[in-house]
């Protein structure tokens, strides 16, 4: 391989609202039987296509899969979203995953996703501490979003496989990544694979990850694993020392401190970032237990609507409960149960 205690609440104003705040490509191996044709060649590249140096990537630790606020008419509420992002970074998160599943990315249009990304930049947030979801069913959309991420300065692009067709050959998934890598060679951005087969229906399986690393070198930086299969996550983390794997649960944080993982990317870190930070930075077992207890409140419930319902409660901001179709508002009984459970955890003092 070539070298190639819960946060103190205060008030924050944003947009008039008051918040309560508590190429790099390796030469292809011709002997590999599943290789796909290269989409570009050196002779066809212009000076503007000349590969640039990949920025240093330091994403690690507690990363919240940050929610995206939705406005009254179904549009992304960027002001409210960036206020939450700032709050999470100030109260424990090492980084953020913008426009992932919790951020309802695939329910927004290409233009809406680009506008949210731009809003993060215009808010002066540290994009070098953030990866942003750029995967799409259409490769042209994935390219456009990944280019925008690179232009704005995000630390990484989190790439879902193209999720409509099921049972596709590995060659098709390699071609998808090839198109993104080739189109962003002049201004590269680190690529993180997003493994969520329950939603996408497709797997970034270990043999395929090895192939992508062999083909595209250091452009492929890591993996977010939302499969819940810790054996798979450990296998993926063992491929290369530099390949960063982030399971989607806080329960993996002890293994991020001294084991195979680079951290976690969690939806419930929207709600328990301070506890996760203690668990990760100082090995605080009590804080980890409280963080996991909060996560388990959502077992058997609709996670994204539930996260947003609890954000509405925590920040005393009812608009946070809005979700984008096809999701629907969290059921009232579930909301009451989750709020009661969360408040009970927060009533305890974590040493």
Regions flagged by a language model, labelled:
Residues 10, 31-32, 44-48:
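Serine residues within intrinsically disordered or low-complexity segments
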């Amino acid at each position: 391989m070539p070298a190639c205690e819960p946060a103190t609440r205060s008030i924050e104003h944003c947009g008039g609202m008051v918040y309560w705040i508590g190429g790099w490509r390796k030469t292809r191996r011709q002997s590999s039987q599943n290789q796909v044709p290269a989409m570009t060649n050196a002779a066809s590249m212009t000076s503007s296509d000349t590969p640039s140096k990949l920025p240093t990537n330091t994403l690690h630790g507690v990363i919240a899969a940050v929610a995206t606020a939705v406005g009254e008419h179904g549009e992304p509420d960027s002001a409210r979203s960036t206020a939450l992002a700032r709050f999470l970074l100030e109260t424990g998160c090492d980084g953020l995953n913008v426009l992932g599943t919790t951020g309802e990315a695939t329910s927004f249009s290409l233009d809406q996703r680009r506008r949210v990304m731009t809003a993060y930049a215009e808010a002066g947030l540290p994009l070098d501490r953030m990866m942003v979801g750029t995967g799409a069913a259409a490769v042209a959309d994935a390219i456009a979003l990944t280019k925008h991420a690179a232009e704005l300065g995000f630390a990484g692009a989190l790439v879902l496989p193209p999720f409509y067709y099921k049972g596709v050959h590995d060659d098709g998934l390699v071609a998808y990544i090839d198109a993104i890598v080739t189109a962003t060679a002049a201004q590269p951005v680190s690529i993180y694979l997003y493994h969520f087969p329950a939603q996408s229906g497709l797997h970034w399986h270990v043999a395929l990850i090895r192939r992508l690393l062999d083909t595209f070198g250091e452009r492929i930086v890591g993996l977010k694993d939302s499969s819940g299969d810790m054996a798979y996550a450990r296998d993926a983390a063992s491929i290369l020392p530099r390949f960063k794997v982030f399971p989607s649960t806080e329960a993996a944080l002890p293994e991020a401190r001294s084991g195979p993982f680079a951290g976690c990317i969690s939806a419930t870190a929207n709600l328990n970032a301070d506890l996760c930070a203690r668990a990760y930075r100082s090995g605080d077992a009590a804080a980890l237990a409280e963080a996991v207890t909060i996560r388990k409140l959502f077992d058997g419930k609709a996670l994204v609507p539930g996260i947003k319902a609890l954000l509405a409660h925590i920040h005393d901001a009812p608009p946070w409960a809005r979700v984008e179709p096809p999701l629907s508002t969290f059921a009232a009984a579930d909301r009451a149960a989750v709020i009661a459970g969360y408040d009970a955890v927060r009533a305890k003092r974590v040493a």
